[in-house]
A protein has these predicted regions:
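C-terminal helix-to-coil terminal segments
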Residues: 88-100, 117, 180, 263-321
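Glycine-rich NAD(P)-binding loop of Rossmann-like domains
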Residues: 118-151, 181, 185
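Short acidic/histidine-rich motifs immediately flanking catalytic phosphotransfer sites
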Residues: 38-43, 58-62, 197-202, 225-228
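Conserved beta-strand positions in the Rossmann-like core of class I SAM-dependent methyltransferases
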Residues: 164
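N-terminal glycine-/charge-rich "phosphate-binding" loop or analogous flexible N-terminal tail
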Residues: 1-41, 306
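Rossmann-like adenosine-cofactor binding region
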Residues: 52-53, 170-271
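A charged, well-structured terminal subsegment
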Residues: 107-130, 293, 304
């Protein structure tokens, strides 16, 4: 089979797939050329490329398989009409959620200790400053309590923090929750603003579903405890850009660490980055362990496709019947 990755430069990803699928051709295309590539591919791996209705006009395409979780850029309705399955890889257990959770905690520490200023002080020979804020005895609010949110909570267990989880439907609803992971409180979406009022650190881990676009907007930021930090390792659209910029400029938000943005690549000259923002280039899941684990899961689903077996983690399972 021919498998096309809709991005260039992901050598580790390509190598992982080729090692797992030695009989298959692994190709690359520019994101804008996804429809053209689909005409000559059995499987597309979109990464961050928009997969529009035009892609599903292909007579050869048999599967759109994401190398990770995010499906927000894929026209799943068009895929369903064309009878083409769309699948992803759950974050937990693949190395993805685990890697993302580690970066989220690193970003909290960078914000609390004002790492950019600390580095600047070093080169200016100013030692003993700035005075930072510890994670210990802080309140961390995790907005979105799926696989990634749970892995963040799991890793915070030894830090002496109070953890409040917020999910759309609250405890006992939605995706399976690991009972071995401790949180001090778990509330549904109605409790979001009350939770934000307690937060020293807000970690956004919610998917960019239609219901979540702009979830952290002016009202949510107005509800936040003054001087709180915010981390986004989910998707840019979950936070309202204008509201975040206003919150940073007013000082209500003490700082933000962003691994995801509203457009990617993001403009390094954007006014937002002149505020107290630590940006990273969407690397939360970019680790050797994640590439290897997700690659194995992707390859396993492609082998199921080849064998005519039931695909796993299909977003439109009705096409499989």
């Amino acid at each position: 089979m021919k498998i096309t990755i809709c991005a260039a430069g992901f050598k580790r990803m390509r190598d992982a797939l080729q090692a797992a699928l030695p009989r298959d051709e692994i190709a690359e295309c520019a994101p804008a050329d996804a429809a053209l590539a689909a005409a000559d591919s059995d499987v597309l791996i979109p990464i961050m490329a928009p997969i529009t209705a035009a892609v599903f006009q292909s007579q050869r395409l048999r599967l759109v398989q994401q190398y990770g979780v995010g499906l927000e850029a894929i026209d799943i309705d068009a895929a369903t009409r064309a009878g083409i399955p769309v699948a992803n890889v759950p974050s937990g257990g693949s190395g993805n959620a685990e890697s993302v959770a580690e970066l989220a905690i690193a970003q909290m520490m960078m914000l609390g200790r004002d790492l950019p200023q600390a580095q600047a002080n070093f080169y200016q020979r100013r030692f003993g400053a700035p005075i930072g804020r510890a994670l210990w005895q802080s309140c961390v609010v995790i907005v979105g309590y799926g696989g990634i949110g749970q892995e963040i909570a799991r890793r915070l267990a030894g830090w002496g923090v109070r953890i409040v989880a917020v999910s759309r439907r609250g405890p006992g609803a939605g995706p399976a929750q690991d009972g071995s992971v401790h949180v001090d409180r778990h509330v549904d979406a109605r409790g979001l603003h009350a939770a934000l009022a307690e937060a020293d650190f807000v970690v956004v881990a919610a998917p960019a579903s239609a219901a979540n676009v702009g979830l952290i907007g002016r009202e949510a930021i107005a509800a936040m405890k003054p001087g709180a930090f915010i981390v986004n390792i989910a998707r840019g659209a979950v936070i309202d850009y204008d509201a975040l910029l206003e919150g940073l400029r007013s000082g209500r938000i003490a700082g933000a660490a962003l691994d995801v943005f509203w457009q990617e690549p993001f403009d390094p000259d954007d006014p937002l980055l002149r505020e107290r923002v630590i940006p990273t280039p969407h690397i939360a899941g970019v680790t050797e362990e994640c590439f290897r684990g997700v690659g194995q899961a992707v390859a396993a689903n492609i082998e199921r496709l080849r064998a005519g077996e039931q695909l796993t983690n299909c977003a439109n399972p009705e096409v499989l019947s």
